[in-house]
Amino acid sequence: RGHCLLVGVPGLAKTLLIKTLAEVINLKFSRVQFTPDLMPSDITGTEILEENVSTGTKSFKFVKGPVFANIILADEINRTPPKTQAALLEAMQEHHVTAAGQKYVLDEPFFVLATQNPIEQEGTYPLPEAQLDRFMFNLWLEYPSRNEEIDIVKSTTSLYAAKLEHVLSKEEIIFYQDLVRRVPVADNVIEYAVNLVGRTRPNGNGTPDFIKSWLSWGAGPRASQYLILGAKTKAILEGRHSPDIEDVRKMAGPVLRHRVVTNFNAEADSVSSVQIIEKLLNTI
């Protein structure tokens, strides 16, 4: 039940990836291209004045926006002002939309994938740390390998058309989401996750000196929760009944990299958040 922030340059098929995912699991897909002039109502929906032809009476009708879907691609979310960003992020957190004092509950499952372009920074509105924290994962999309790119060119410049089949239903996805939360976790695994997150905080107990030097802010409790949920999911996907510490370590990169805030010292030393997390994992 977490959302994902995808970071990658244009042309890496982020839209195709998400659209294909929505098709194979038979979910409603919606794409929102974020621009500087996008308004909150363009995402959540708006009220229109509607006239009843038979009675002549007029009333307001709520027209649902693109947020009323199961999988939403928020393309270049950092290109729109904070007010519009907040409209989507509120829906992500609360799973409902409020318009004109009326609450509209979103369909489940509800999953947002937001994208950011790491190259172009002019005219963008970076997401604040508090809003970045609402994304479970931060995934970096790399360029394809040479062989992968050859296969891509062959398939996309011919008449080849992939045939997609539904493999899951809404009900099955919700069942598996609940199943993950029923997976037992040993106390030492939870303690490891909490200790790992705690050591990202510059003022925490037992924080390494390099964290104090390179980070101005660490991850909050939500990171510990997502480390355990991610570890649970990884365990059952691999046919195991319970996660171990290695599962938590595998989740550390995508869960923590957008939750730690580097300072000027890290920038001066050319150290990224990913490198800091890797160094931290080597100390625990």
Annotate the PLM regions.
Residues 50-73:
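Conserved alpha-helical scaffold flanking the Walker A/P-loop in AAA+ ATPase domains
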Residues 9, 43, 115:
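P-loop (Walker A) phosphate-binding loop of NTP-binding proteins
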Residues 202-284:
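C-terminal engagement/docking regions of AAA+ P-loop ATPases
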Residues 4, 72, 110:
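Conserved beta-strand position immediately N-terminal to the Walker
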Residues 163-224:
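Conserved AAA+ ATPase small/helical "lid" subdomain
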Residues 1-36:
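Walker A/P-loop
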Residues 50-55, 80, 84, 92-182, ...:
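Canonical AAA+ ATPase core
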Residues 8, 75-76, 87:
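Walker B catalytic acidic pair
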